[in-house]
């Protein structure tokens, strides 16, 4: 009888672990951030005050703000403050590369995930890390804005 209880408890625990992995909510199912220069794993923790958009981004790697007009407007303000001096107000590039063409310096930066990684962690040359200057939510809004700029050019 006692052995049966342990077997059932073990089975329940095992099913709980397997269930966690299949729902997409376990830590192992979260996005694996990578350094844009070295492709090494990059630790980007989910902040305790994360917005729903940041939580979804950490789960999927997709930007929930893409196409969101309010987020794009806020992203434009942030872009003009932090990014326009190197990438130009229209995104055409100066010190930094163009953000409105289809040429990417790093393989991963053609995705919202790769763009987030390079803004957060930095790149080569003048591209400094912005992970301590902007919140993760703000970075997602900047990406929504640059995606909007790119779509306008096509």
Feature map (PLM): residue ranges:
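Bacterial N-terminal signal peptides that target proteins for export
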Residues: 1-10
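Bacterial N-terminal signal peptides
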Residues: 9-18
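Periplasmic c-type cytochrome electron-transfer domains
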Residues: 21-74, 109-110, 131-148
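Sequence/structural segment immediately N-terminal to covalent heme-attachment motifs in c-type
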Residues: 52-55, 68-90, 105, 113-121
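Inter-heme linker and motif-flanking segments adjacent to c-type heme-binding CXXCH motifs
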Residues: 92, 148-154
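Short cysteine/histidine-rich zinc-coordinating motifs and their immediately flanking basic loops
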Residues: 95-100
